C-alpha cells in the first residue's frame, strides 16, 4: 500500500513513547492484577477519573484473593460512579476462577487469560503484552484510529473484520519490547492521534510512513458505521423518606444495573394522582409531596427520561430497605441514574 512500511512502526514509536509517555500509576508496575484492573476500569471511563478509583480499589483489595472474597455490596460501593457494573462483577468472577484454578496466580498464557470471565481479546492482549511481554496485540479504539490513518483505510473501524485485520497485521511486527509497543500505540491514539479532533500530525513520530498524512485524509478518518438510535424510556422515580430514612430496593440479579440499589421506580411519567396511588400500592401512606425534579441518564442503547418525586410517607415499611443518609453514602452503591436524585437531596439535607 503506497509507501507504508509497517515494519518501521516499532522503531518509530518506541523511542517516542519512552520520551513522551504520560506518567500513570498502572504504568509503574508489571503486576498483572494491577494492569488487568486498570484496563477494565479504563473501558468507557476517562484516564483522570480512573486514577482515584484505581488507587482506592487496590488499597481496599490489594490481591486477587481479596477481590475474590469481597462482599458484593462492598465491591459495588468501590465501583460506584464508574458505571457499567457488569465490569466489576466479572472482575470478581475472574478472580474466583484464578483462585480456584490457578492457586491465586494470574495465568501467563494468552488463551488462559482470554478464557477468564469478562476478558476479551483486547484486555487479554493488553495484560499479556504489558505484564509478560508476550507479542500479542491489544486493539482498542485508539489503536484502530491510528491504524485507519496510517493505512488511509476508510473501512468502518467498528466492523469485526477490520479489527481482526488490524490485529493480524500488528501481530506480524510485534517487537520483543511488547509491553512498551502496546502502550506506545495506545498513547499515540490517546494523545497525538486523538479522537474527535484534528490529529497533531506535526508532532507524530509516524508521519513519514502515514498514508493518511501523505494523502491529506487523516482528518477525515476513522470512519464508523451509523449509530443505532437510542430507545427512549420514561420513568418515575420515588425518593421516599420517613423520619430521616430513605427507601431503597435491590434491582434484579440479571439485566440492566443488575443487583444494585435503586430508589423505587416505575415505567412512565405519572401525574400527582397516579403517583400517590402507586405509593399506596407499595403499601405506604403518602403524607406530602416535597418536590419534583426531572433528570435524564444515557446508557449505551437506552435513554431514561426520569421524573423524580420526593415524597414523605407515614411509616418506614412497604418491604423496602430503609437507609439513613450516612448509610447510603457509606454502604449503598447507587448507579448514576439514581445518584442524580440523591445528590439533589443531599444539597437540601
Name each model-derived stretch.
Residues 1-22, 28, 190-349:
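Intrinsically disordered, low-complexity, charged terminal extensions of DNA damage-control enzymes
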Residues 2-7, 11-202, 209-215, 219, ...:
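Catalytic cores of DNA base-excision repair glycosylases
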